[in-house]
Amino acid sequence: MAAMASTAFAPSVSSTTNKLFDSSFHGAPMSPSLLRLQPIKSSRPNNLSISASASPPYDLNTFKFDPIKESIVSREMTRRYMTDMITYADTDVVVVGAGSAGLSCAYELSKNPNIQIAIIEQSVSPGGGAWLGGQLFSAMVVRKPAHIFLDELGIDYDEQDNYVVIKHAALFTSTIMSKLLARPNVKLFNAVAAEDLIVKGGRVGGVVTNWALVSMNHDTQSCMDPNVMEAKVVVSSCGHDGPFGATGVKRLKSIGMIEEVPGMKALDMNSAEDAIVRLTREVVPGMIVTGMEVAEIDGAPRMGPTFGAMMISGQKAAHLALKSLGQPNALDGTYVGGVHPELILAAADSAETADA
């Protein structure tokens, strides 16, 4: 069901308006001295001081761990996990898919301490495709104004006229995960698949879950019944089509709740990212679709290796969920506190199919 925390410490600079060099986007040659890009924008001052002679706070020659019984380790893991399963068996929001859209959605939701969020991720490693940029390269490109979200997370980047570049995509994914999972109202269930939906009276009311390895082997074994997780709102962020992709909307089609899943169209970055954010919505009662799964249900273009729409689509999905729950949100003007400019841009309710 994949949709798709350490922060980079780099030299900070003064103004967001200063440019290190004129963008070479249109082919202008760069000076050799500028071929090694340096960050020209940092979200916070760099107060880190590292000494090469610093030693660990213990003697590495005589180090020994405190003793422990093996059964204690087993009990600690089992007790805590089972407690989480009991706690989140009936929850406010289930986010299916922990890619960049799903993580951004859960992060935004978790700011409200009254909302309980469960994240279901079929992979052992959450993050979806957001551990790398395009073609397995390292850098992550984010178009403005989505960089405001990166500022909130405290992630450094190189700033250009209309976009920013994080030196490694893993910095975004690890940072948002570490901040998100530290919050008391969030639980990530990774290596867990959402096999089906709970539907009552025409409304999605939760998900049917199973261990991911069990879900992948139903053809080889029998009698491996699932479990369930009820939720007031389900956010489907299962990514584009694939073995575990777009499974939320594909299931809606198979049970007759939507008419078709036309699939995403050919790549067009400019129209794709705007369309993904604009078309993020509650597609059937109780189920919100976000991220690249939006392109699958609406026939919007694919965006390729740019990630801003994933973040802002996730944020919009969170505020749609808050609205559904009767909580303050940025879409109807009831949100308390500062609202990101990009969320105002994302507040359109139009469900118009994108024209590729």
From Swiss-Prot:
Entry's SUPFAM superfamilies? FAD/NAD(P)-binding domain (SSF51905)
Write out the catalysed reaction. [ADP-thiazole synthase]-L-cysteine + glycine + NAD(+) = [ADP-thiazole synthase]-dehydroalanine + ADP-5-ethyl-4-methylthiazole-2-carboxylate + nicotinamide + 3 H2O + 2 H(+)
Which residues are listed for substrate binding in this entry?
Answer: 101, 121-122, 129, 194, 225, 240, 292, 302-304
| EC number of this enzyme | 2.4.2.60
Give the record's cofactor note, including how many are bound: Binds 1 Fe cation per subunit.
Q: Which residues carry this modification: 2,3-didehydroalanine (Cys)?
A: 223
The transit peptide of this chain lies at: 1-51
Q: Which InterPro entries match?
A: FAD/NAD-bd_sf (IPR036188), Sti35 (IPR027495), Thi4_fam (IPR002922)
Would you say which domain of life the source belongs to?
Eukaryota
Q: What does this protein do?
A: Involved in biosynthesis of the thiamine precursor thiazole. Catalyzes the conversion of NAD and glycine to adenosine diphosphate 5-(2-hydroxyethyl)-4-methylthiazole-2-carboxylic acid (ADT), an adenylated thiazole intermediate. The reaction includes an iron-dependent sulfide transfer from a conserved cysteine residue of the protein to a thiazole intermediate. The enzyme can only undergo a single turnover, which suggests it is a suicide enzyme. May have additional roles in adaptation to various stress conditions and in DNA damage tolerance.
Similarity comment text for this entry: Belongs to the THI4 family.
Q: What is this protein called?
A: Thiamine thiazole synthase, chloroplastic
Q: Which gene encodes it?
A: THI1
